[in-house]
Structures are given as C-alpha cells and as structure tokens.
Amino acid sequence: MKFPETHRDLFADEVKAFAFLSTTMASGTPQVTPIWFDLEKDYILLNSARGRVKDRNMRARPNVALAIVDPNNPYRYIQVRGKVIKITEEGARAHIDRLAKKYLGKKIFPGDPSEVRVTYFVQPEAFSTMG
C-alpha cells in the first residue's frame, strides 16, 4: 500500500517522530505504547524485547494500529492500520542499534544487553491523515 505523500515526511529519520502502537490484549481491550520505528521498503519496522506485553499481543493478535504525530504540530498526524506479517529475532539487535542512532544519536542501544530483541514487520492496510 502506498504511503500518503502529504505525511511521508513523518517517517523520515531526521523527524524522529514516535509511533503510538495499539495492540489488543487477550481480553479484547486495547494496549497503547509509544515506540520507535523506521521503514524498510513498504513495511514499518518496530522493535521490542521478547516477552513484553506488546510482543505477546502482536504474536497472538497481529492486527495493529499506529498513530504517528508530527513533533512540531500535534494537530498533524497519520494513522496506520495494518498487520504484523513477520516477527524475527534475526538482526533485531542491529535494528535496535539503528533506532538508537536515529532517536538518541548513540551507536549502541543503551538498554539491557541480555534482552532478546525482536523486530516486527508491519504491512500497512489503511491510512488516515489529519493536518
């Protein structure tokens, strides 16, 4: 699915926008987490540690929604609804390091090195925009 050009800039590394990820708990209630992200081809890539709530939710219920807000204008945002189509630990440590460079300016992610990192590939299915 093609990203709306009017809001494509929110995905640029230099913007450093956070995504607010909505997953679904086993009870059916929503769970929202601010999260770092980047793009690879037409996929939105997310990263977490194995066993966290969002990890468990995305494995069990792969439909997700993300809201990405313009850091310079909170009334401008894009909502993405999609599906996690791939979950992998392969390359996930390098991916979180890449995200740490984008968001923190650090070469190495400063989190717990014993965590098993996981990368999630989200395939967008629908977009809506504001502003």
Describe the predicted segments one by one.
Residues 1-19:
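Extreme N-terminal tail/first-helix region
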Residues 1-3, 76-131:
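Charged, gly/pro-rich active-site loop segments
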Residues 6-7, 54, 95:
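Hydrophobic alpha-helical segments typical of transmembrane helices
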Residues 10-12, 57-58, 99, 122:
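A generic structural signal for nonpolar/aromatic side chains embedded in well-ordered alpha-helices
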Residues 16-50, 58, 64-68, 79:
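Short beta-strand segments
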Residues 52-54, 73:
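Short, surface-exposed beta-strand-loop junctions and turns on beta-sheet-rich folds
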Residues 55-61, 77, 105:
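A short, polar/proline- and glycine-enriched secondary-structure boundary/capping micro-motif
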